[in-house]
Amino acid sequence: MIISFYYGWKKIQPFNLEVRSKNLTVSVIVAVRNEEDNINRLIQNLKSQDYNPSLFDIIIINDHSIDNSLEILKNERLKCSNLKISSLEKNCIGKKQAILKGVKLSSSDIILTTDADCKFSNSWISNMVNKFSNTDINLISGPVAYHLEDSTFANMQSLEFLSLVGSGAACIGLNKPVFCNAANMAYRRDVFLEVNDYINNNVFSGDDVFLLHHIKNKYKGSILFLKSFESIVYTKPLSNIKDFINQRIRWAAKSNSYKDFDTIVVALLIFLSNASLVLLLLLSPFNF
């Protein structure tokens, strides 16, 4: 498995921004819930992008925030002409519904998603959108990494998360995409609307992976991973082991809904690898 991942990673060509995308319109969609500490920085990060401001807008969907997120957004809108704000209705909740609402509000060619607590370079939009000049490309998965912190637990998370991102990228390199991360993901709006009805709406989260699977099945060979330092989106590691375990439980819960063969095989191999490591640790005392 490791050899296959290495081969898949090497197959991905490093990205070089040689030709600017011609007049592709972009909507950056962010779902927010109680993000008052992050919104100002997020908007400033997006306003500083080197992509033509007339070709992109920012759509923030408020997912029932109970802090000052909505008030901060309204103040930011006075200073940012391409910022759009909307809130989920009472009977709708969660990131999946927020993204769907944002896509329906958009009229752009390309949808680019990230999270409120993320940071990225000023050329992030330009890089993520560039490959869509090729009309055969429908989805681009971008790199995501944790901020390095002075904490053993945080750095362990960073290493583990890096292996997940690398594995996902390698599978794309092998033309067998299995997962991606909505914190750094771009796709054609019309393709999203085309396949959205087939995405499992009984699963609360995981819309990024299910979207990737449906695009993979309908448009084979149309998914890329962007191997570029300038395209990395940085996010925060979890603060404690409890949150880490809960996150992994959420991820595992949606795996029962996966129907993609490649994803099931990779998940099984990873499970067996981890199980063998645990077994080795348990048996090691008997060797002394």
Residue ranges and their predicted role:
Residues 1-5, 255-288:
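Alpha-helical bilayer-embedded segments of polytopic membrane proteins, i.e.
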Residues 88-106, 127:
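Glycine-rich, basic loop-to-helix element that forms the pyrophosphate-binding segment
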